[in-house]
Each structure stands twice: as structure tokens, then as C-alpha cells.
């Protein structure tokens, strides 16, 4: 779901899930780093009265209010960039979905942030799976995702967060999983 099927046999279906290491995150982390460091250096240049930037001279700016504003934007941009780089280094959200008929178990595994929830692992019985549910919302912020409906639990998301997968890919993955588990596909 969001990744390729790693192992598929008549007994085991394993699907890798892409986490935070996506091109869009690398792109925005790079842009935020450049912008944040640039604003930070511009603010510090106005404070020290010494040019710390290569591309322009910001020593002529008054520290209050322009330099303070530049420092604020620099700290904010660098914080966002740091968060993005950290999530990519930890590969938050990555993992796998494994459906094992031999052991009769469904294992949903994801990596989280450090702490007690670093390893997120949900294990259910295949017999408890009621259906595979496809959720499709179009509009400004489209959402296309697959969920596993399990008895006495809320729906478990199977697809990665972020960019929605194509409709045909969603249909194919949902149908493949429903066929493998022998349950209905809902929502299409």
C-alpha cells in the first residue's frame, strides 16, 4: 500500500509502506533549510553590523524591527527544516502490512518518533477481518486510502499518509487484498 509487494505467495502477502523519505519532503526540507539559514544570517548581520551573507549586504538594516523579524523567520524556518530532516532520518511512517494465512495473523507495522511509541505494531487475526474499505474524497484536498475493517476495532489505515495514490492503483490494491483475505471490498 503505497509501496511494492515484497513477498507474495499463496500463504503470505507483504506490502511495504513508504514513510517520510519522499521526494516532496526532501524538496521542502532543502527549501526550508536554505530560507531559514538565509533569514537567520540576515538577522544576525543586522545585529552585528557585519555581512554574513554571500548574496546581499544586510548590514544596513536596523536590528529593531527588521533584524528581529528576520531572526524570527530564520528560527521558524530552521525549526521546520529540522523537523523535516528528523522525520526523514527516522523514516517516520514507514513499515509494512503483512497478511499471513499460515499463522492466521494480520500484522500492521509502522515506525514512529522515539519514545514508547517508536514501534507501532498491530496484530489481528485474519478471522476478525470483516472487509477492506476504500475511502475516496475528491476536491481541493483529495484523499484516497484503504482501510482494514476489523471486529471491535476502529478502521486501520493501510496506505501511506501524504500524496494520494491514483484511483486505479487504489482499486487494484484493494481488490488484490480483498481477494487474498477472502473478504468484501467496500466503498467503490
UniProtKB/Swiss-Prot annotation:
GO terms for biological process: photosynthesis. Seems to be required for the assembly of the photosystem I complex. Keywords: Membrane, Photosynthesis, Thylakoid, Transmembrane, Transmembrane helix. This is Photosystem I assembly protein Ycf4. Its main location: membrane. The chain crosses the membrane at residues 26-48, 63-85. It is found in: Cellular thylakoid membrane. InterPro entries: PSI_Ycf4_assembly (IPR003359). Belongs to the Ycf4 family. GO terms for cellular component: photosystem I; plasma membrane-derived thylakoid membrane. It is a multi-pass membrane protein. The keyword Membrane applies.
Amino acid at each position: 500500500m503505497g509501496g511494492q509487494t515484497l513477498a507474495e505467495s499463496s500463504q503470505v502477502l507483504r506490502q511495504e509502506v513508504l514513510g517520510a523519505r519522499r521526494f516532496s519532503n526532501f524538496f521542502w526540507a532543502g527549501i526550508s533549510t536554505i530560507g531559514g539559514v538565509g533569514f537567520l544570517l540576515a538577522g544576525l548581520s543586522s545585529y552585528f553590523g557585519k555581512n554574513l551573507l554571500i548574496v546581499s549586504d544586510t548590514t544596513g538594516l536596523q536590528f529593531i524591527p527588521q533584524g528581529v523579524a528576520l531572526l524570527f523567520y530564520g528560527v521558524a524556518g530552521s525549526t521546520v527544516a529540522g523537523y523535516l530532516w528528523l522525520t526523514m532520518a527516522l523514516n517516520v511512517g514507514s513499515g509494512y502490512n503483512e497478511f499471513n494465512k499460515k499463522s492466521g495473523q494480520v500484522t500492521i507495522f509502522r515506525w514512529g518518533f522515539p519514545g514508547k511509541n517508536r514501534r507501532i505494531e498491530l496484530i489481528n487475526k485474519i478471522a476478525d477481518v470483516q472487509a477492506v474499505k476504500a475511502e475516496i474524497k475528491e476536491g481541493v484536498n483529495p484523499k484516497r486510502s484503504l482501510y482494514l475493517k476489523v471486529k471491535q476495532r476502529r478502521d486501520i489505515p493501510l496506505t501511506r499518509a501524504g500524496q494520494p495514490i491514483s484511483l486505479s492503483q487504489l482499486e487494484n490494491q484493494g481488490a488484490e487484498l480483498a481477494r487474498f483475505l477472502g473478504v468484501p471490498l467496500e466503498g467503490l
